[in-house]
Regions:
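Low-acidity, Ser/Thr- and Arg-rich intrinsically disordered low-complexity segments
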Residues: 2-10
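N-terminal accessory targeting/assembly segments
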Residues: 15-72, 77-78
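Generic hydrophobic/aromatic pocket-lining and core-packing "Φ" positions
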Residues: 39, 70, 96-100, 177
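Redox-cofactor binding/interface segments in oxidoreductases and associated redox assembly factors
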Residues: 82-86, 112
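Glycine/threonine-rich flexible loop motifs
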Residues: 88-96
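Extreme N-terminal, non-catalytic leader segments
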Residues: 99-101, 105-157
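Walker A (P-loop) phosphate-binding motif
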Residues: 145-178
Length: 178
């Protein structure tokens, strides 16, 4: 996905740096398990890469990782807050923005797969820049991906497709990778 480096002032994202591990999974106020499929997938398939999860008291689900706030996650070595849910409408709630700002203040980068880009929220973009943090919008491809040619390449690939956002493509791909 595309990343916006804190040092970048252009509208074009630099080459995508790796998302730093381990993660703090952000569940916010998730109403159910389906709302936070990303967090569940990472907790299930990469538990060793998660220090814990941050969920608000009214959240109706958890991933089974230790509950903690941003400061505790930073003390335990978290490097990136991973936005692990996608609400209907795909926007960041004001309360979430405050939590994301707190994560940046604690020295964490932020990774998100939501439709709304992290750097489209001025407060997040400005804070990341001032703190030297990186914002990863993983839904956006980096500009360096070449256009396909149809020519055979080395390696194996598998396309997983589904008719909606809840068809199990990620879990299928990760199960095959394992």
């Amino acid at each position: 996905g595309a990343s916006t480096s804190a040092s970048s002032n252009s509208g074009t994202a630099p080459p995508s740096p790796m998302i730093r591990k381990p993660y703090l999974l952000f569940l916010a106020d998730a109403p159910d398990r389906n709302a936070c499929k990303t967090a569940f997938g990472v907790a299930f398939w990469r538990p060793h890469e998660c220090v814990g999860e941050l969920r608000y008291p009214e959240a109706k689900t958890d991933c089974g990782t230790p509950a903690m706030d941003v400061r505790e996650a930073a003390r335990r070595g978290a490097k990136t807050l991973l936005v692990g849910l996608a609400p209907s409408g795909g926007a960041f709630a004001p309360r979430w923005i405050e939590t994301l700002l707190e994560a940046l203040d604690a020295g964490l980068d932020i990774a998100s797969g939501m439709h709304v880009r992290l750097d489209s929220v001025d407060a997040i973009k400005d804070r990341a820049r001032s703190k030297g943090r990186t914002l990863h919008d993983v839904r956006l491809p980096p500009p360096s991906i070449p256009v396909g040619t149809g020519r055979k390449r080395p390696g194996k690939r598998l396309l997983t497709v589904g008719t909606d956002c809840n068809a199990g493509k990620m879990f299928t791909s990760l199960a095959l990778e394992k």
